């Protein structure tokens, strides 16, 4: 029982043709400015904890933020902070509904007269909500059995759903982050 087979995400150096340890990555680390993007993900199924028929009408979106936009084609999930306060708002101009962290609302909607708050919930209430994939590459992962078969991980509810993780904050972005398990150690752990 001391040895098991599993998968682990490691950085790879194309120059050296080998994987790198976290220690090697930390050497010579420099802060730098990376591009960040906010993407809207169309909600297709409301979570069990929230009674919201409008959520499935095609005009409700999660606003997710990422500093790794090149990983968006591999998106398989979204993540909220379990104890963070989130709001569903109605954009008065477009009529669309958006879900994001309450603490980040003023960063995205500067004028309070441009929106109306529909309700406020904790991140843990959104677990299990489903959304439409950005790209068709991994649509098979919607199905739980296919997701488990392809990823080699236990996917009880399939991909393209809401998860919770304590590392999600409201310091930047929308309070919702995108998950690409193939590209990040934290993302991979959340998806397991």
What are the language-model segments listed below?
Residues 2-192:
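NTP-handling and nucleic-acid-processing catalytic cores
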